[in-house]
Amino acid sequence: MATNESVSIFSSASLAVEYVDSLLPENPLQEPFKNAWNYMLNNYTKFQIATWGSLIVHEALYFLFCLPGFLFQFIPYMKKYKIQKDKPETWENQWKCFKVLLFNHFCIQLPLICGTYYFTEYFNIPYDWERMPRWYFLLARCFGCAVIEDTWHYFLHRLLHHKRIYKYIHKVHHEFQAPFGMEAEYAHPLETLILGTGFFIGIVLLCDHVILLWAWVTIRLLETIDVHSGYDIPLNPLNLIPFYAGSRHHDFHHMNFIGNYASTFTWWDRIFGTDSQYNAYNEKRKKFEKKTE
């Protein structure tokens, strides 16, 4: 009975979304995107698309999303939004971070990316335009991937903070007490594999088109670079997402070393009480800001 009701609610929600979608004006970018997509399919093999296409998407988006935070350090106006104002970025730390990123991206992540083609072949994941999902189904699946990754990340991240193993693996990521965007994937190779597994679980369970791989990469990079940015920017549209952790939530984890273990959402920290120190800190901060107004 409950299952039938759930299916009925889901069907009604799908119909409602489809109806709203039919009322929206036609996307002027759809035709150019369709032509570009078909050009890619006609001129490159599936292996090239899945491997080199995925690598280009990851590298281009990673450093593009890092760029605003990198530029903020040169803009005096933005300093008031920096969370840990007493710990500015240094060229030495950023250069060290960049070198480790290149190693992780090309020596750890690239071999994993090379398996993308074989994954799509094994599970018969389509590439063609005709079977590309509608935007709302794509967003729904990306949200599902985010929930799965966040759950994996919370428990494995918390495990990596265990006193017996912390110094061997996760300590690398905590070398910078005040995070900055480029540091999002600065980690021990084993951590890259352990926490990165959460990214792929959602893909294995939910992927119905190769575009989901790239859409999920885009969302995950945007989120992880945002929470590592070190800046709490007003009117950040990501903060409109219910239960979104945000930069202050994760910045406290780097500052305090314990608590706030989740990557994207706040519910696991709230359920297990691992945000108690953060909540106390936040209350003190807000009281102090009121006094100084």
Swiss-Prot record:
Keyword Chloroplast annotated: no
GO MF terms held by the record: C-4 methylsterol oxidase activity; iron ion binding
Transmembrane segments: 55-75, 100-120, 199-219
Domain Fatty acid hydroxylase: 145-274
Extent of motif Histidine box-3: 249-255
Cofactor dependency: Fe cation
Family: Belongs to the sterol desaturase family.
Disease named in the record: Microcephaly, congenital cataract, and psoriasiform dermatitis: An autosomal recessive inborn error of cholesterol metabolism characterized by accumulation of a large amount of methylsterols, particularly dimethylsterols, in affected individuals. Patients manifest psoriasiform dermatitis, arthralgias, congenital cataracts, microcephaly, and developmental delay.
Annotated protein name in UniProt: Methylsterol monooxygenase 1
Gene transcribed to yield this protein: MSMO1
